[in-house]
Amino acid sequence: MVISVATPRRSIRDAVLGGVLGAGGRQLYQPLRCAFYDGAAGGGLTAALSEDGAEGGVPLPCGRKTAAAKNVLILMSDTGGGHRASAEALRDAFRLEFGDAYQVFVRDLGKEYGGWPLNDMERSYKFMIRHVRLWKVAFHGTSPRWVHGMYLAALAYFYANEVVAGIMRYNPDIIISVHPLMQHIPLWVLKWQSLHPKVPFVTVITDLNTCHPTWFHHGVTRCYCPSAEVAKRALLRGLEPSQIRVYGLPIRPSFCRAVLDKDELRKELDMDPDLPAVLLMGGGEGMGPVEETATALSDELYDRRRRRPVGQIVVICGRNQVLRSTLQSSRWNVPVKIRGFEKQMEKWMGACDCIITKAGPGTIAEALIRGLPIILNDFIPGQEVGNVPYVVDNGAGVFSKDPREAARQVARWFTTHTNELRRYSLNALKLAQPEAVFDIVKDIHKLQQQPATVTRIPYSLTSSFSYSI
């Protein structure tokens, strides 16, 4: 006689830790071996919340929906400005494409619901990128699967209940991650709660070429890659071709569909209407050799023989108030505009003829859409290294860490090498993908309309939920 015995359900913390660490982390990224179907009744959100709520104090969901609206939860972290920018671009695209059909919430799950180090990632990241050797060690040191797998499993053990609370607060119909550390723990939680694939989970990668391995998780419904190079990395990391889409980097809709006239923009921004303009940036934090490059540009863009400028400069200092104050107190040979943190970059880019910037993916993608030839003057080790060949090899710009040489290149483009400037501009436009953000939200909309289907789950996860008697 066969007797069925109901085994008590372990807590989410024990299940995650046991499943991931039970084999010393060896099965963390094994090939997907089993299928999971979520179409049957039973379990699901209510049951999961009632069980874990009694144990871990997880509140009932309070995300309210209108009669027809679907909730979209976008997970991000302010480790650099690109993740939030992509999240807000997706939010705006949902609103433009589908109106009130979706309610979109952009949340930093680690900061709002996690403890240390999740709630301290922004400060830690800013510290490390100011000490680039430290960041380089952190980036490459956590690349092996067993290293970041153990690290994320430990975080899941301590903060799983908090993550459950954060996710269920918004009662999401779709979850989007735009950060490499926002896949693993939420996916573990969803699978434990029997909500995946009923709740589609998609990743939107915000690095153009060089990606940290934590971007790639086998359990996602879809992985949106900004370039063919990233798609190749996704395949090498074990994702199936059916999970991968290559649409480009999501950029604010104001960049994608606004038709801006350069002459009108220069009039609006109080710029010289006749002089070519170079845009100098250092990212949201005003990093890199911005001051040195601005000084060199002031010298190189002044024709001493004719005693007149051959170009003008726009400097975006971001949140770096010290840099802005220093530049405002300097004397210049040519017209200069010095700005702080800008929310209307599409206007400043539309008014300029080329750009000098560090190799941030968002700035590169925006410059390509505007057809701006790019001079890359710096990069963050790790995720931005591959952005340099992405620009240079595609003929959209050049790389020079020397501020004086970068300034000379601009002077040549504005005087004797104008044909070269036009060629780089055309190549930039060819590389641009202005509709990427709309293509992504349209594809997510199609996913949401599909019924729950069979999805494959890593063996390590399913094995942790199985008990032999």
Curated annotation (Swiss-Prot):
> Which InterPro entries would you find in this protein's record?
Diacylglyc_glucosyltr_N, Glyco_trans_28_C, Glycosyltransf_28_UgtP
The EC number on file is 2.4.1.46
An annotated GO cellular component of this protein is: chloroplast membrane
Known catalytic reactions: a 1,2-diacyl-sn-glycerol + UDP-alpha-D-galactose = a 1,2-diacyl-3-O-(beta-D-galactosyl)-sn-glycerol + UDP + H(+)
User: What span is annotated as transit peptide?
Assistant: 1-42
Q: Which UniProt keywords apply?
A: Chloroplast, Glycosyltransferase, Membrane, Plastid, Transferase, Transit peptide
Location(s), subcellular: Plastid, Chloroplast membrane
A GO molecular function annotation here is:
1,2-diacylglycerol 3-beta-galactosyltransferase activity
What Pfam families has UniProt attached to this entry? Glyco_tran_28_C, MGDG_synth
Name any Gene Ontology BP term: glycolipid biosynthetic process
Extract the PANTHER family matched here. Answer: MONOGALACTOSYLDIACYLGLYCEROL SYNTHASE, MONOGALACTOSYLDIACYLGLYCEROL SYNTHASE 2, CHLOROPLASTIC-RELATED
**What task does this protein carry out?**
Involved in the synthesis of the major structural component of photosynthetic membranes.
Q: Which family does it belong to?
A: Belongs to the glycosyltransferase 28 family.
Q: Report what the protein is called.
A: Probable monogalactosyldiacylglycerol synthase 2, chloroplastic
Name its species: Oryza sativa subsp. indica
